[in-house]
């Protein structure tokens, strides 16, 4: 059973910026399930997409892999000779726990977990690249360059899977979707204090884009096709095909 997320359950005098440290890594499975609507569906479908798009003797990347949920889903689904998965995260606490989880299961598809900044990783001969709720934590000025790098490293016909929290230009729609997300968190046992303090901690480090911004970026970089394939409230996932 996952350790319960109680990080923001008591009043904090000075709320610092949210970081993926040891405390977060310890409760991350509980936190993510109770915070992101549709997370399990996204993880399952990432495996389905990887099964469809992974090619023999190619690389599959999970950039910002955290505890390896997407990596494990893809490893269970990929059945291609010579295909390997490379997971990358810059949190030592996440990487340490991720390696333990990966090594707990045997598979014919090799997995390497790297502790590194995803902006510094070479993307080579890739058939599948996953950014699962990762891009939104990068400085907006760095996002286009990372996606260009991914595009350059993808094989023709390769797929990028990008899951993100979204903002919406229509103010009424945006507020409604935020409220529904908070209702989702309340239904999963988070208190008003927890919701408020988590929002204060994360608002300066997670800066979401609109769906239109994502699509425009994909188009400018050269992806031939992109679309939202899953959305629940203001969270969703897109694909972009080279």
Swiss-Prot record:
**InterPro entries linked to this entry:** CmoA, Methyltransf_25, SAM-dependent_MTases_sf
The reply to whether Transferase figures as a keyword in the UniProt entry is yes
Q: What is its EC number?
A: 2.1.3.-
Annotated membrane-spanning segments are none
* Reaction(s) the record says it catalyses: prephenate + S-adenosyl-L-methionine = carboxy-S-adenosyl-L-methionine + 3-phenylpyruvate + H2O
Q: Which CDD domains match?
A: AdoMet_MTases
One annotated GO biological process:
tRNA wobble uridine modification
Tell me what this protein is called. Carboxy-S-adenosyl-L-methionine synthase
Species per Swiss-Prot/TrEMBL record: Aliivibrio fischeri (strain ATCC 700601 / ES114)
Q: Gene encoding it?
A: cmoA
């Amino acid at each position: 059973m996952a350790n319960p997320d109680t990080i923001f359950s008591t009043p904090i005098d000075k709320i610092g910026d949210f970081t993926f440290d040891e405390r977060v890594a310890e409760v991350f499975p509980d936190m993510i399930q109770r915070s992101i609507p549709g997370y399990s569906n996204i993880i399952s479908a990432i495996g389905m997409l990887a099964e469809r798009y992974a090619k023999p003797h190619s690389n599959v990347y999970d950039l910002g892999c955290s505890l390896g949920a997407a990596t494990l889903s893809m490893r269970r689904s990929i059945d291609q000779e010579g295909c390997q998965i490379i997971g990358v995260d810059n949190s030592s606490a996440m990487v340490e726990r991720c390696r333990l989880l990966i090594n707990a299961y045997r598979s014919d598809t090799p997995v390497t977990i790297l502790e590194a900044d995803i902006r510094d990783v070479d993307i080579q001969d890739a058939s599948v690249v996953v950014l699962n709720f990762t891009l939104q934590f990068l400085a907006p000025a760095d996002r286009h360059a990372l996606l260009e790098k991914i595009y350059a490293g993808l094989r023709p016909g390769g797929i990028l899977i990008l899951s993100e929290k979204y903002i919406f230009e229509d103010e009424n729609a945006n507020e409604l979707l935020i409220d529904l997300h908070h209702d989702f968190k309340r239904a999963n046992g988070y208190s008003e204090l927890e919701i408020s303090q988590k929002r204060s901690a994360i608002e300066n480090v997670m800066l979401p884009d609109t769906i239109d911004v994502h699509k425009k970026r994909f188009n400018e970089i050269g992806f031939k096709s992109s679309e939202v394939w899953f959305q629940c409230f203001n969270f969703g996932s897109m694909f972009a095909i080279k």
